[in-house]
A protein has these predicted regions:
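Short, flexible catalytic-loop segment of classical short-chain dehydrogenase/reductase
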Residues: 166-177
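Conserved hydrophobic beta-strands of the Rossmann-like cofactor-binding core
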Residues: 62-66
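Catalytic loop of short-chain dehydrogenase/reductase
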Residues: 68-72, 79-89, 93, 102, ...
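Active-site loop of short-chain dehydrogenase/reductase
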Residues: 30-31, 58-59, 112-125, 157-161, ...
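A short helix-coil junction within the Rossmann-fold of NAD(P)-dependent oxidoreductases
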Residues: 55-56, 69-74, 107-119
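Short-chain dehydrogenase/reductase
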Residues: 1-56, 67-71, 75-81, 85-89
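C-terminal helical subdomain
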Residues: 164, 182-236
Length: 236
């Protein structure tokens, strides 16, 4: 479990730490291991996977979930149109996004190829052939979808699959802080996308979905899982 702040130092003034996240994994029956890593820094990423190789010798599942476009340090958006928005928003979305995904995946794949098995899940926020109201965001998300398609082509011979997974409006800490909760009927818990990841990772035929951008809601129908409260949202 990587990517959040550690030992009380904060990322974007958020109080949550990677130790807390790892503890949550352990509490749910897994084994959470907190590792500090800046996924936009190639040295950090290389060091992370060197440690994984030394300790485990392989990696079976990689979930890329990084997005830098919401940081409070970014300038306030000047308007809705791309020429009214700061280029810093574009840089943040692409660097802490598609760039970080590629850096991480290119270090993970060599640990998947020897056993001829692996799954890369790239978290995205929109499906192919949809248009966002924000050009920078649209390009950032479609870059993730496109890289997933090309990954499928290059990884197929090694039996490694790549899927772009699109959750709905998740009830993250930011969303909860903004006043949204279960009563709104539109948000979903982070466990919902987690269950989608588990469904994909345990599907012996996941290669049939490789290269696609798929909504969590579609997978909920296919695999028959629900959110923790028993609901099953079907629209993004």
């Amino acid at each position: 479990m990587t990517g959040r702040s550690i030992h009380g130092s904060t990322t974007d003034n958020r109080p949550e730490t990677i130790e807390e996240t790892a503890a949550g994994v352990t509490a749910r029956g897994g084994k959470g291991i907190a590792v500090r890593c800046d996924h936009t820094d190639s040295t950090d990423v290389c060091r992370l996977f060197e440690g994984i190789k030394d300790q485990h010798g392989r990696i079976d599942l990689l979930v890329n979930s990084v997005f830098g476009g919401s940081e409070s340090s970014l300038p306030r958006a000047g308007g809705r149109r791309f020429w009214e928005r700061s280029e810093e928003h574009w840089d943040a979305m692409m660097v802490a996004g598609a760039h970080a995904y590629v850096l991480t995946a290119r270090n993970a794949v060599p640990l998947m190829i020897p056993q001829q098995k692996g799954l890369i899940i790239n978290i995205t926020a929109q499906l192919d052939n949809t248009i966002s109201a924000n050009l920078y965001y649209d390009l950032a998300m479609n870059a993730v979808n496109r890289m997933t398609l090309v990954m499928e082509k290059e990884l197929k011979e090694y039996n490694v699959s790549a899927v772009a997974l699109c959750p709905g409006w998740m009830r993250t800490e930011r969303v909860v802080d903004a006043g949204f909760g279960p009563e709104d009927g539109a948000t979903e818990t982070t466990a919902y996308v987690g269950r989608a990841v588990v469904a994909l990772a345990t599907d012996a035929h996941v290669a049939s979905l490789s290269g696609r951008a798929i909504e969590v809601a579609e997978l909920a129908r296919t695999y028959g899982f629900t959110d923790v409260d028993g609901t099953r949202l079907f629209t993004h």
